[in-house]
């Protein structure tokens, strides 16, 4: 099970939201690059970054910040948030992003996904489905799509998509456990590779999530639980007297 730390960027800062609510925002670091380096030093094998400003506006507001992160680290970076055109995808992939996540556009402009699959392999293009009670939400979770989550997944599957990033909005940022039943139901019906997201709070959640591997759930994105140090092993990664060093510590993880 690949564990992927999340970095959400809003107004140039590293933040976390509760259930996607922009009014419930907590700033963790002013510089998202520092956060990315911390996660890499803690041996992350991949990062999931969301441009929250872009999710709302469709403009690549934090492009330069993301470019700095991609240039600095030696691991794949997955990008989501407001990616709604071939040009945006090309700019990210040309920058060196490992793969892009298409969210709202999969609902509002499904033909775009078909075009993307003609230009790039499925390993580069994934679709993000953020669902509440089984219904995908779009445009920064502010609008309903009017279809079932698995229906959208099957449409994307027909276009050549092989992986879905699935978020149970009701669990995201709540620190109350992930949506086991909703994720299992979705994975069973979709028949695709699934990266679970939203609500994983502790090691027990990870163990439960691992039981869904037979249904295609092979990875998980973790946000707030990491930021709140909910995993005991994180205490070993921090130097509480001096603070974590971004340039060198006992980790063998490398920066470029």
Swiss-Prot record:
Catalysed reactions listed for this entry: 1-(5-phospho-beta-D-ribosyl)-5-[(5-phospho-beta-D-ribosylamino)methylideneamino]imidazole-4-carboxamide = 5-[(5-phospho-1-deoxy-D-ribulos-1-ylimino)methylamino]-1-(5-phospho-beta-D-ribosyl)imidazole-4-carboxamide
Disulphide bond pairs: none
Keywords for the protein's UniProt record, in alphabetical order: Amino-acid biosynthesis, Cytoplasm, Histidine biosynthesis, Isomerase
EC supergroup of this enzyme: isomerase
The keyword Hydrolase appears for this protein: no
Pathway: Amino-acid biosynthesis; L-histidine biosynthesis; L-histidine from 5-phospho-alpha-D-ribose 1-diphosphate: step 4/9
BP GO terms, sorted: L-histidine biosynthetic process; L-tryptophan biosynthetic process
Family to which the UniProt record says this protein belongs: Belongs to the HisA/HisF family.
Cross-referenced PANTHER family: 1-(5-PHOSPHORIBOSYL)-5-[(5-PHOSPHORIBOSYLAMINO)METHYLIDENEAMINO] IMIDAZOLE-4-CARBOXAMIDE ISOMERASE (PTHR43090:SF2)
Protein name: 1-(5-phosphoribosyl)-5-[(5-phosphoribosylamino)methylideneamino] imidazole-4-carboxamide isomerase
Source species: Chlorobium phaeovibrioides (strain DSM 265 / 1930)
Taxonomy of the source species: Bacteria, Pseudomonadati, Chlorobiota, Chlorobiia, Chlorobiales
């Amino acid at each position: 099970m690949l564990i992927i730390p999340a970095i959400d960027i809003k107004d140039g800062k590293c933040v976390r939201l509760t259930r996607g609510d922009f009014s419930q925002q907590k700033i963790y670091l002013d510089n998202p690059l520092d956060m990315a380096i911390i996660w890499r030093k803690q041996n992350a094998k991949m990062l999931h970054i969301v441009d929250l400003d872009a999710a709302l506006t469709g403009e690549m507001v934090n492009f330069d910040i993301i470019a700095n992160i991609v240039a600095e680290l030696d691991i794949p970076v997955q990008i989501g948030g407001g990616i709604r055109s071939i040009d945006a995808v090309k700019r990210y992939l040309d920058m060196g992003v490992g793969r892009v996540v298409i969210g709202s556009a999969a609902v509002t402009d499904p033909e775009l996904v078909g075009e993307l699959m003609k230009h790039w392999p499925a390993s580069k293009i994934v679709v993000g489905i953020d669902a509440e009670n089984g219904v995908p939400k779009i445009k920064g979770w502010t609008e309903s799509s009017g279809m079932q989550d698995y229906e959208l997944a099957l449409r994307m599957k027909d276009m050549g998509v092989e992986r879905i990033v699935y978020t149970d909005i009701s669990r995201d940022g709540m620190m109350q456990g992930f949506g086991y039943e909703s994720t299992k139901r979705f994975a069973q019906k979709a028949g695709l590779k699934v990266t679970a997201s939203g609500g994983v709070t502790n090691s027990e959640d990870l163990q439960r999530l691992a039981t869904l591997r037979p249904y295609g759930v092979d990875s998980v994105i973790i946000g707030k639980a990491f930021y709140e140090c909910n995993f005991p092993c994180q205490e070993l990664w921090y130097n509480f007297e001096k603070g974590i060093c971004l340039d060198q510590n006992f980790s063998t993880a490398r920066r470029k």
